[in-house]
Amino acid sequence: MGKKFLVLCLLVGCSFSCAQQKVSFYSLKYKIFPKINIPSNSDVYMQKAALEFQKNFEILTKTKLTIEERTRFDKTENVLVLRVNPTQSSDFCIKKNKLNTTIVASSVENLHFGINEFFIKYTSLNFKQKSKQVGNPQLTYDIDLNSEINECYKADFSYREPYYSRNFNSDYSRWHKTNYLDLNWGIWGHNIPKILKKYQLPESAYAEVNGRRNKQQFCFSSNDLFKYLSTEIIKIYESDNALDRFMILPNDNFLSCTCDKCKKLGNTPTNASPAVFTFLNKLARKYKKLHFFTSAYNTVTEVPDFKAEKNIGLFYSTIKIQKGIPIEKSRYYNRFKKDITNWKDHVDDVYIWDYTVNFDNYFDLYPSLKVTQDNLKLYKKLGVHGVFLHGSEYNYSTLEDLKTYVFARMLWDTDIDLKEEITSFLNDNYSKKVAKLLSEFYIYLTDSFYNSKKELSIYSGIHQTAAKYLDPELLFTFYEDFDKYVQSNQYNQNYLQIATALTFLKLEIMRDYGFGKYGYARLFNNEIRVKSEIGTLLDKLDSYSRLAKISTYNEIQSSLRKYIIGWRETIFRYHRRNSYFFKKKFEVLSSLDEDYTNTSYLNDGAFGLLDYNTNWLLCSVDDLVLKVKKEDVKNSKEITFSFLQDTKHRIYFPEVIRIKDTENNTIKRFRLPVEKDKWLKKEFVLRLPTEYEDEQLSDEFIISIEKKRGIGKNTLAVDEIIFN
């Protein structure tokens, strides 16, 4: 299942029989060796394809086949014929007529896919053997094929890329029939400045914004920009003809050129599509063999009112609508369908840029395979030609080996049996018991993720992950079961990587739950008691991650070492500290940010770390002002505040904390010292009035936390407020 092919079954001997005669393709015993045939005067790319077949065959049989270049050959010869036919509709076909075996593809790239499919289907060679270059020791060294074969294969998408590190290996991508941008793209992303940095570009190459040239953006009606970029494009292509795709994107901002030429083409201060697509058309007409793409992004979101050339394509990003729910079942479907339909009317090649991990936490299992499968079926139905599945790039993410494999299979054929593929992969890569344990766990989570109606964005904290699909009881039980196998596989990278991720997830769940059964601590008579298990888990995370050579856990490369240090510092401070304000009611008197209204963060027992997505309440529209009842915290001697400073995101410590009565009279005032560290979490303690002081707390009192003043919109990040 999963392979798309047409089998022509020729009747042999009886019209009711589909049994075929076998002919020997290779036999060491009888000295039967096929020759690899490619056309006379083949280019280097065809020669590389022949070498791929030769290499695979040598790994399998320890026999090195001869490669010959000649266009004509005797049909009675035992030859493996490799050909490219750009006019055929199938990606590749495998054919046999008596002794001649032919693999013919629509492109050299597809020829590599066809060669590897030959070994998958007709021999015992698998990818593990190929990657280790060790064949099957039990092979009889005889390969027999049916005397007549005619099988043709066509993928559901012409461009298929799961963007995970395993797919960056060319052997892997060719074996699994995927694309890899380094092997296909001459220019990728927002890299025009990098490509042109060697030139001293004239002013006319830059955008005119508000009547002045601005070097932060390009002018896409500029003849100078076209001249310099054309020069670099042809240099790149001539250095490697496989690099025939070029992404032409404006710089990553919202500036649009409004010079006279661009305005005449249709540009406005917010829409650069007319000039960008005119520029693309000009490139496409000049280089008809190349393919040029842009992206529906920032100032290029409006469909131009003219048709793009046939060798122009567009990437459409799902970043704003990828919420862990199949798009067709979401509130975004109608808009999405309309957008794709509109773009398809003007651009022949529409590709989807999709997302398959939680970029805030690469250890989140994020089991979106079933959702992705539904989305791929939708993309196919809407006429999308290519899909780029953005994964964890060069970084490890949980079970990325499984996800890369399944996504590769799914991009080729959207109708694969998902459970069968998951089970098959795990059985091939883990012991029988561990494979069963992993399969049951992961398939259950995949179903839970798919069936949940709750949205989970690709930038989410553990709280949202747990609410969507990750039941703590299930995770903790699985953790104990899997960890037993890790102890006996301490030098196996796959086990260590999964153990690192699961330990991190368990700690995150415990941190988020705060106190109680699933939390990191318990509360006894208002005193925090940190569980002894936490120290063990932190030691394991440190050990597993070092052995697995994993040092970060998200897109912004947050350090695991700092994560562990942050945990240890926090539990050292928290253990046996009083907490009189835990989950007590309070009133918020200030305005809250639209996306940050969960004020339970302030006294739920959970604590934040250096990542602002971990239990921090962010306030940018106003200071934070709370009203608290004195009776609820009557035994407290002081208030301990936790704040975050992350200057990259304009998050700063507050300037002043005030305690006021309900008449707005100041009872206590504390000015915080200025901290120069750009990224820091810190506690500040404010002593409450003693019975001997003149100013006393009123029955209801106000806590006013005043954010840093200055130019621009600064943000305040507050975590636990502990009365102790």
Where are these regions (language model features)?
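Acidic, contiguous N-terminal accessory segments
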Residues: 17-98, 125
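Catalytic domains of carbohydrate-active enzymes that cleave complex glycans
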Residues: 411-604
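Short beta-strand-plus-loop segments that form exposed binding edges in beta-rich domains
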Residues: 704-712
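Short, surface-exposed beta-strand/strand-loop-strand elements in extracellular ectodomains
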Residues: 650-664
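Extracellular carbohydrate recognition and processing domains
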Residues: 666-692
